[in-house]
């Protein structure tokens, strides 16, 4: 480990951080200056080829010292200016990716058609109508009838439950002849009831859709007789054609680098074990704008390639211009390298996929030439907080029913969730590029939730979108706590509301119009439920505080009495609970039938279900208020900030819980007092809502605790098969994550500017390779001068990123820091090394060719 109490001369200190033989270190130590040192490292002529920048000239030599395997893998290249670079990505072979402008206004579209300026969608593929399309249309028609029938009966019952039944006796002409106050008193109860009835019908129809989806999923999984199952079209052992090349792409942005590259390594090794590695390439597509994380990604890429011998198969690209977020990241990949591949598998930063699953997806694509997207059903795993474990259990137990049910109703016109799916590259390039939504405001601009839109465009072009719901080997992780989940929901809510602008776009398949609608209802149902509860409370207030109007028309002989039918209310309440909770019971019954050992046994899985149901009841009102806020914020253009502090073990601090849930607690308390004052008996009906709101702070904090999650696992509660018998890929991910965190790189930009090896790596991976021009030299000089003046603590992020992307500027900064012995840079770097218990001992030992050469932060 470094000892800052024994200062060294800068030249000797520099050489101590290069893995050299003692004789070579002594020879280089005779250099009179750093310029001479870099010239000796680079060899004769190299400095002149690098344009007179000695530190830039020695980049290759320094990299060879730290990572001699780069030479064996032929990873070095020289650009047009004679500067060394690493072949971190394949040669670019550009493909046109042209998004079609959206025409969301049907009036404008009609006018353009009348004036002969219509721009129709691109023509569909000339494919015969398959049998599954007719079957799917019939099934969805039946689903619609079931939902409407069920909703009609429930709404009829609800109408009979409401107390005011005399709306038909209200005479509009009579209302115009009386005072406004009398009119309000007479009509207000019926207006409120009408609002309650309308909201109830919408919400019940939404619940009904989920019920029938789960019910048919239960039938599919119980019988196993799904003749349209996409995974049944391949035996799973067919040879993959040599030209069926597949790119596995992982878009990332400011992610947890140790976890991301651990999961990717597990996936790469699993793929290699199948023997099909030659047909797959891996791409890490970074949109990271944090310089420290960007340097950590570069080092992690090198270590990953070294450990897996993946040079030339695992590629890395960081965008300097972050356009259109994730969809733009994918577009950029398709534009540069999409023409080299027949298929593309998209993974999230937390995704892990087995090699068998990846190979199976390619075989399914080969066996189904009409398929454009095949989506797997990722299994959630890998988290330890109590909240995450409950969510993992819920998605693992209940999720298969809903996924199989979606497949039953949608068949080849299904969902795409944006990750853990395979895509046919050419139609994706031709039809799925996303133009920004026209106009101004919060619902214009770059599309946020791209996945549903891409699936709709793929289907509009005539290609199928399938869910391989029974395909194993696809995994993901869930947010560790409620607040992190809500932060994700904030983005999804806005994105789904934006997508609804595409509901009437020409050529969209009716199923995908329905998908846009269900995406909106996933979040719009929250304010609808909230307003339903508010109107119910308002009706209670009207009933208690206003004198009933018994005679609603002149010369009426008999009064209209408010009515109350508790037996109907109980029946309707029971029916609603059945629709909500029967799918969960059916899921557990399916596990009973097929074997509950992986879930902890029959008793444990049943107890886990009951506990999860209890927590879901507690959390539903909390989510309702947050989602209501998100919807209102999106419509009103409000900015909702979520600047969560760094947490230990992903736990929610009490201070943050109070800040996020404090208003909900006060609302629950005020609501309780109001209803208790109006009619205490009504609290029995409202207690699950207001009680959950008042308990939101402790529930949010306690459920985020890792200790409680681990204790539940020890008791076999919320156990999932991936924990009982952990797949090889998940075991490897955990192991590699632990290893990566052990030597995780900190202060990445500082070390890229100062450390001899990391500076060489960053320079070789820099992508801003400009020709020589006076204007460029002026900008470089300004950036370097700013870095020297401000120091590592005060330098802004934009300048750091610009320096990191420019190998010339970064090498000059590196040289100037050492030549001038800049204490603000060198002192900060030495302190960071001293504070790192896993930093390498200096002087670094020589790396023998063929050994696993390591960068400094990776040694222990």
UniProtKB/Swiss-Prot annotation:
<dbReference type="InterPro" id="IPR001173">
    <property type="entry name" value="Glyco_trans_2-like"/>
</dbReference>
<dbReference type="GO" id="GO:0005886">
    <property type="term" value="C:plasma membrane"/>
</dbReference>
<keyword id="KW-0997">Cell inner membrane</keyword>
<keyword id="KW-1003">Cell membrane</keyword>
<keyword id="KW-0472">Membrane</keyword>
<comment type="similarity">
    <text>Belongs to the glycosyltransferase 2 family. OpgH subfamily.</text>
</comment>
<feature type="transmembrane region" description="Helical">
    <location>
        <begin position="682"/>
        <end position="702"/>
    </location>
</feature>
<feature type="transmembrane region" description="Helical">
    <location>
        <begin position="187"/>
        <end position="207"/>
    </location>
</feature>
<dbReference type="GO" id="GO:0016758">
    <property type="term" value="F:hexosyltransferase activity"/>
</dbReference>
<feature type="transmembrane region" description="Helical">
    <location>
        <begin position="599"/>
        <end position="619"/>
    </location>
</feature>
<feature type="transmembrane region" description="Helical">
    <location>
        <begin position="515"/>
        <end position="535"/>
    </location>
</feature>
<dbReference type="InterPro" id="IPR029044">
    <property type="entry name" value="Nucleotide-diphossugar_trans"/>
</dbReference>
<dbReference type="InterPro" id="IPR050321">
    <property type="entry name" value="Glycosyltr_2/OpgH_subfam"/>
</dbReference>
<dbReference type="Pfam" id="PF00535">
    <property type="entry name" value="Glycos_transf_2"/>
</dbReference>
<comment type="pathway">
    <text>Glycan metabolism; osmoregulated periplasmic glucan (OPG) biosynthesis.</text>
</comment>
<dbReference type="GO" id="GO:0009250">
    <property type="term" value="P:glucan biosynthetic process"/>
</dbReference>
<keyword id="KW-0328">Glycosyltransferase</keyword>
<keyword id="KW-1133">Transmembrane helix</keyword>
<protein>
    <recommendedName>
        <fullName>Glucans biosynthesis glucosyltransferase H</fullName>
        <ecNumber>2.4.1.-</ecNumber>
    </recommendedName>
</protein>
<feature type="transmembrane region" description="Helical">
    <location>
        <begin position="572"/>
        <end position="592"/>
    </location>
</feature>
<keyword id="KW-0808">Transferase</keyword>
<keyword id="KW-0812">Transmembrane</keyword>
<dbReference type="InterPro" id="IPR023725">
    <property type="entry name" value="Glucans_biosynth_gluTrFase_H"/>
</dbReference>
<comment type="function">
    <text>Involved in the biosynthesis of osmoregulated periplasmic glucans (OPGs).</text>
</comment>
<feature type="transmembrane region" description="Helical">
    <location>
        <begin position="141"/>
        <end position="161"/>
    </location>
</feature>
